[in-house]
């Protein structure tokens, strides 16, 4: 499901869809910071208000967010910033599964994995 300008543009309807899914027993929600430039995460966060503990919440980072070349990739700096931004948009203090949307050819995999390990701490 996509929410925001890339998908369902009706925010209230998007929240109803998520609520119906949760009521039907779905307990895994996956989104990404790049989906609708963060709007999908914001809508998911609103929908999960009061129900966060009932859901395994996943999101992703890597893809460009805007034209700034520093707002993308697998560098430690970007991963930490992207995680903080996702937490804020999702209105939560933890993400159950934080995923790399795709590997970065510009960043050593050890840097990416090190940043992800530090986020767990």
Positions of predicted regions on the chain:
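Active-site beta-loop-alpha junctions enriched in small/polar residues
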Residues: 1-2, 32-34, 60-64, 100-103
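N-terminal binding-site loop/beta-alpha segment at the start of enzyme catalytic domains
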Residues: 1-55, 121
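A short acidic, helix-capping loop that chelates divalent metal ions and anchors anionic groups
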Residues: 2-7, 64-70
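Structural preference for beta-strand elements that scaffold enzyme active sites
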Residues: 27-28, 54-60, 94-97
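P-loop/Walker A phosphate-binding loop and immediately adjacent motor/lid segment at beta-alpha junctions
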Residues: 52, 61-64, 116
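Glycine/proline-rich, positively charged
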Residues: 66-121
């Amino acid at each position: 499901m996509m929410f925001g300008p890339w998908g369902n543009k009706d925010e209230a309807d998007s929240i109803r869809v998520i609520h119906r899914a949760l009521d039907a027993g779905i307990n895994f929600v996956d989104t990404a910071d790049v989906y609708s430039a963060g709007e999908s995460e914001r809508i998911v966060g609103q929908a999960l208000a009061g129900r966060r503990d009932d859901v395994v919440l996943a999101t992703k980072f890597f893809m460009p967010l805007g034209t700034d070349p520093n707002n993308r990739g697998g560098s430690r700096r970007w991963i930490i910033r992207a995680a903080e931004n996702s937490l804020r948009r999702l209105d939560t203090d933890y993400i159950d599964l934080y995923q790399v949307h795709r590997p970065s050819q510009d960043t050593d995999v050890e840097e990416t994995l090190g940043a992800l390990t530090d986020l767990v701490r």
